[in-house]
Amino acid sequence: MLRNKPRAAVTTKKQTSLLMADQPPPPKPNTCHCSPSLFSSPKFRFFTSKMMMTPFDSDFSLVSPTSILEANPSIFSSKNPKPVSYFEPTIPNPQRFHSPDVFGLADLVKDGDSNRDHSRKPVNKMVLFGSKLRVQIPSSADFGTKTGIRYPPCQLSPCVQTKVLAVSEIDQTEDYTRVISHGPNPTITHIFDNSVFVEATPCSVPLPQPAMETKSTESFLSRCFTCKKNLDQKQDIYIYRGEKGFCSSECRYQEMLLDQMET
């Protein structure tokens, strides 16, 4: 009996240890203490409650003092698709300007006729046609005879200056005009700058005849310019400046030295 008692005690201890092993361990106490300054904020509680209640693809905006999405719906939402025109750039409609009223000569004449019919006073037209213009242009054969301005045969207008110019002055003038009038009284008018010369018949103002430079009958190729030696056409002739002939290069060189000394 005494031997069976300790065996029974041992078996009871084994059974109790097996029962303790089958039961789950008790939960450990939560030792994490969150900071009350951050997680106790009402904004954080609202944010966590929203995150738990609403999925991420729903339309909600974060509450923050500087959020620009508080009053606007979420642009990342896929439940409300945007129309195609939402992504297209808006192009303003072009302004259409009315074409101005364009009037031609015929419209002006019609308006003038209508105004003249309705009003008693005549309307002065600003448009003149070529058929209504009465301008008589004398022909070239009658020029100077049918015009209103007439002068005696040898009388000139007081504004015309008559003077005799030298040949050198005429050559230097750049403005030169010659007018020939045909008809019963043909005249030739020469205009040199500010001077006017009229050549008419029977009396006329004599024009200065340019004096022709009398060239010597002897050509410059017939005699040497330096030594005055007659030049033979069969021999070489040296020319200087196109107007002086020489029999040799020495005579031409002497003339070239003289020209350099003079200049």
UniProtKB/Swiss-Prot annotation:
Where are the FLZ-type Zn fingers located? Answer: 219-263
Give the principal location in a single coarse category.
cytoplasm
Localization per record: Cytoplasm, Stress granule; Cytoplasm, P-body
PROSITE patterns (alphabetical):
ZF_FLZ (PS51795)
Q: State if Zinc is listed as a keyword.
A: yes
Name the keywords, alphabetized: Cytoplasm, Metal-binding, Zinc, Zinc-finger
Q: What induces it?
A: Up-regulated by abscisic acid. Down-regulated by the transcription factor ERF114. Down-regulated by glucose, sucrose and mannose. Induced by abscissic acid (ABA).
Q: What does this protein do?
A: May act as an adapter to facilitate the interaction of SnRK1 complex with effector proteins, conferring tissue- and stimulus-type specific differences in the SnRK1 regulation pathway. Involved in seed dormancy control.
**Into which family does the record put it?**
Belongs to the FLZ family.
PANTHER family named in the record: FCS-LIKE ZINC FINGER 8, PROTEIN MARD1
What is the name attached to this protein's record? Protein MARD1
Identify the species of origin: Arabidopsis thaliana
Gene name? MARD1
